[in-house]
């Protein structure tokens, strides 16, 4: 008999409709069946990037599971090139999920990140240099524009998920890219797995303590998000502003170096980072968005100015059809 897996925010999941980001891998497949066991209402969404030979089979498996268990299954075909794949895949994935959430009336998005993912992130950030604001990575619950993002497996090891699937003889797919030694995360994975085998409870308790301390230090998240635009009112302390910018950049797949943090402070929070991300500040607050080069027609440019959206962020707002604050 395997250990009973406790889902975080379980009672909250029973309130309203849930959308599960599904891939057919160990994590999301385990979460699929754990939600079924608890009779928590959910549907699934899968993005097929056509990067792996088994991608078509994974999509078929998702549709089969959904049909068998009377769930809706939304799929998106999204071929991407190899350049900056992880970043682009993340943007497309969240764009797809959020469009479904708003169109179909889901209350929350469920993702299957687990304790190993949290430890890998922490190790990477320690190696690269990080403050507490970005050291912990994701939280079990985040408030987004119009929905909640919840990670029910945030305190569960991947080993426990394997045990659960094997015990119940549930089919799943292994992501071949996890064995690629090029991504930094994959190089930390063997160390993370060893640490969790020997010190899982101690590491989990440390994450809980650090999370509590981060909440005391930085308070609640005041950010508003629309597509890939983040906005929040300027905070009293610059450390709070930096923390919220760090979180927003992470969501866009970008992690600032120490030099870039200094540049950001010197600029008064008005800078473009490596031609990828634009940060601007106005009397309305601080804005973060992907950097775009586009000529904005005069009428739209004036609307963005009146809305007090900073110049460096305006091209993205124009491209995304955002001409006022929410």
UniProtKB/Swiss-Prot annotation:
Enzyme class label: ligase
Binding-site residues, ATP: 23-28
Localization per record: Cytoplasm
Role according to the record: Ligates lysine onto the cytidine present at position 34 of the AUA codon-specific tRNA(Ile) that contains the anticodon CAU, in an ATP-dependent manner. Cytidine is converted to lysidine, thus changing the amino acid specificity of the tRNA from methionine to isoleucine.
Origin species: Wolinella succinogenes (strain ATCC 29543 / DSM 1740 / CCUG 13145 / JCM 31913 / LMG 7466 / NCTC 11488 / FDC 602W)
Keywords recorded for this protein, A-Z: ATP-binding, Cytoplasm, Ligase, Nucleotide-binding, tRNA processing
UniProt-listed Enzyme Commission number(s): 6.3.4.19
Family statement: Belongs to the tRNA(Ile)-lysidine synthase family.
Principal cellular location given in the protein's record: cytoplasm
A GO cellular-component term linked to this record: cytoplasm
Family matches, as PANTHER family: TRNA(ILE)-LYSIDINE SYNTHASE-RELATED
Keyword presence, ATP-binding: yes
GO molecular function list: ATP binding; tRNA(Ile)-lysidine synthase activity
Name of the coding gene: tilS
Example of a GO biological process term: tRNA modification
Entry text on domains: The N-terminal region contains the highly conserved SGGXDS motif, predicted to be a P-loop motif involved in ATP binding.
Name used for this protein in its record: tRNA(Ile)-lysidine synthase
Domain of life: Bacteria
HAMAP family given in the database record: tRNA_Ile_lys_synt (MF_01161)
Reactions accelerated catalytically: cytidine(34) in tRNA(Ile2) + L-lysine + ATP = lysidine(34) in tRNA(Ile2) + AMP + diphosphate + H(+)
């Amino acid at each position: 008999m395997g250990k009973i897996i406790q889902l975080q925010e379980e009672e909250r999941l029973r309130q309203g409709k849930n959308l599960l980001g599904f891939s057919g891998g160990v994590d999301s497949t385990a979460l699929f069946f754990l939600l079924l066991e608890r009779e928590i209402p959910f549907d699934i969404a899968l993005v097929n990037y056509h990067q792996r030979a088994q991608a078509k089979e994974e999509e078929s498996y998702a549709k089969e599971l959904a049909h068998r268990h009377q769930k809706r299954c939304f799929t998106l075909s999204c071929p991407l090139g190899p350049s900056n794949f992880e970043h682009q895949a993340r943007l497309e994935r969240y764009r797809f999920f959020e469009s479904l959430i708003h169109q179909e009336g889901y209350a929350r998005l469920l993702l299957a990140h687990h304790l190993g993912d949290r430890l890998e992130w922490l190790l990477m950030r320690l190696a690269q240099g990080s403050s507490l604001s970005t050291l912990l990575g994701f939280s079990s619950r985040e408030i987004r524009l119009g929905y909640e993002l919840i990670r029910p497996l945030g305190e569960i090891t991947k080993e426990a998920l394997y045990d659960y699937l094997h015990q119940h003889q549930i089919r799943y797919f292994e992501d071949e890219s996890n064995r690629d030694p090029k991504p930094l995360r994959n190089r930390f994975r063997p160390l993370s797995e060893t640490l969790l085998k020997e010190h899982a409870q101690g590491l989990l308790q440390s994450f809980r303590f650090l999370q509590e301390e981060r909440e005391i230090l930085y308070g609640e998240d005041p950010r508003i998000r629309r597509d890939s635009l983040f906005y929040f009112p300027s905070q009293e302390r610059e450390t709070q502003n930096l923390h919220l910018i760090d979180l927003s950049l992470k969501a866009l797949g970008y992690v600032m170096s120490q030099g870039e943090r200094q540049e950001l402070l010197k600029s008064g929070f008005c800078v473009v980072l490596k031609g990828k991300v634009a940060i601007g500040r106005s009397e309305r607050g601080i804005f973060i968005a992907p950097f775009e080069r586009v000529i904005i027609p005069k009428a739209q440019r004036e609307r963005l100015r009146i809305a007090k959206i900073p110049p460096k962020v305006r091209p993205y707002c124009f491209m995304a059809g955002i001409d006022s604050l929410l």
